[in-house]
Amino acid sequence: MFRHGATDWARQGRHTGRTDRPLLPEGEAEARALAPLLAAIPFGAVLTSPLQRARRTCELAGFGAVAQPCSDLMEWDYGRWEGITTAEIRRTIPGWTVWSHGCPDGEDKAMVEQRCSAVIERALALAAASPEPGPARLALFGHGHLLRSLAGTWLGLGAGGGALLVLGTGGIGVLGYEREQRVLLRWNGWPAPAATMEGRPEPASGSPLPGQ
């Protein structure tokens, strides 16, 4: 899983759901940095959010010609909190988080979890149909809160489990299995040798970046 590169609103900490902000130059650089890493990996399928920040990241990473749009990979619908920072929201709702309170006129974690489950079902079906030998690999390009929710859902924690998982712009997360157990193989990493995409030789590292 790959979070899109930096945007102006992400850098300002503004909740960026369906507002279609473009990548900053630094966000495009983050996306291009993925290309040499991913070129060595045979993906059976590539899915991307149709929002331009994710789609452009996918293109710059080298998959624009083969990516399939997936509306369920779109970021949370933040409703009335679109474009608003957490600090601003907490002036009226102390302790607010997207995980605990949801978004008026938008989505809550239960609604997002339904979308995450649909993405997982689609990904598993694509993996089962992959002609590549060995374990199938799929690439998903999306957004911070959505991909965190997806990881939580994969692990059986529900979308709310994403509260425990930070994913910076341009960050990488790898979901997979240890035997039959669903696990995180890598989390919040940045471009590195291809072997680490398999969860070896070391776990994910990296400091969180600001933004939603």
Language-model segments: which ranges?
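GST superfamily/GST-like fold recognition
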Residues: 144-148, 178
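Short, hydrophobic/glycine-enriched beta-strand segments
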Residues: 1-4, 140
